[in-house]
Amino acid sequence: MVSTFKYLGAIISDEGSKKEVICRIAQATAALTKLSTIWKDKEISLSTKIRLMRSLVTSIFLPVCESWTLNKDIEKRIHAFEMRCYRRILGITYRDRVTNIQVVEKVRAAAGPFVELLRVVRKRKLKWFGHVTRGTGLSKTILQGTVPGKRGRGRPRRTWTDNIRDWTGLEGDALLRRAENRKGWRKLAYVASAVPQRPIRLRDR
């Protein structure tokens, strides 16, 4: 029995989503580096650079993000990766003593409303949960099913649906009933996907 394998381009591991997220960050960072000449080109506007980054870099990171189980460590990695991308585009290093809040303000001023990458991931997960809950296929059976047998010793591992319960504040039948209402779930997903405000600091370590 193997503990890790690759399926349809995604890393499946019995240790959770960390390896897959790290791999996606590495792939997206490589794409970011290959486009360095664009980021350094002063003839290209900042708003255009930001659109290109979101189209050509974060698009590499996001596939299958709906399947990830997030924890604090993974969320910090996602946030740090996003800030690293914007700093590269802006030509700002950590030695410049510019906070992440200031980076976001510069991005917002150049490209309009700012939606955190982590919020995009959370919203996609919530949207997928609603889609599966309203369906009738195997995905719904697996999502709502239980594994027979006794649970092993120690603290239980964080599950995919733990994220949904934590973000929405709902559990059990109440969660399922809300998800079955397409319009109501869309509104809840917008609110529940919001990322708590982080303290001002230069970087996420």
Q: Regions from the language model: what does each represent?
A:
Residues 1-205:
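Short linear motifs embedded in intrinsically disordered, charge-biased segments
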